[in-house]
Every structure is written in structure tokens, then in C-alpha cells.
């Protein structure tokens, strides 16, 4: 499965994109995003460390394997629907 994110916020704050993680063994892929995801990836002291950050640039589309561990690089921003983080997300299957 592939995932796509299109950033749709004009002039977003710096460091408001997407971060991909890898673990101590160099693995980028996880076992899905079940309840263990937050505990194993996002909590401090985790074996999963930030590996790559993609900046949030208006109208940029990023494509990645859907099983890569990822999260926003910072907390969501804005205090209303008009000023918050806006993205279009999609998923698709393709054989390469």
C-alpha cells in the first residue's frame, strides 16, 4: 500500500511537515499503526528515532510506503479550521 499527503496550508510554520522514523536496527517499516504505535514510536526513549523530515510546502505531494513509521514533525498548528494544518491524504495499491 502507498500513502500520499498533499500539504494545503499556504505559508505554513517551519518544521510542520512529516517525519519518518527508523529503529536501532535500521528498519524503517513497522507492524502497522495499532495501539502499540504510539508507545513504540512517539514516546521519548523509544528505539525509533527520527530519520528523515519532509517540509510542509504548499501544494507539495509526498508519496511513501504506507507501513513506514511517520508522524507530523511538530504538533498541529493553528487555533481554528482556517489557520490549522490542512492536508489531503490518500491511499492506493500498486504493483511495481
Describe each model-derived feature in a short phrase.
Residues 1-96:
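Catalytic core of non-heme Fe(II) oxygenases with the double-stranded beta-helix
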Amino acid at each position: 500500500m502507498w500513502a500520499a499527503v498533499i500539504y494545503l496550508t499556504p505559508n505554513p510554520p517551519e518544521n510542520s511537515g512529516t517525519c519518518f522514523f527508523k529503529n536501532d536496527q535500521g528498519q524503517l517499516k513497522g507492524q502497522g499503526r495499532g495501539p502499540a504505535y504510539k508507545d513504540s514510536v512517539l514516546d521519548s526513549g523509544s528505539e525509533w528515532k527520527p530519520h528523515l523530515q519532509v517540509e510542509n510546502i504548499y501544494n507539495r505531494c509526498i508519496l511513501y510506503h504506507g507501513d513506514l513509521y511517520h508522524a507530523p514533525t511538530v504538533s498541529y498548528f493553528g487555533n481554528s479550521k482556517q489557520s490549522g494544518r490542512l492536508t489531503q491524504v490518500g491511499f492506493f495499491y500498486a504493483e511495481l
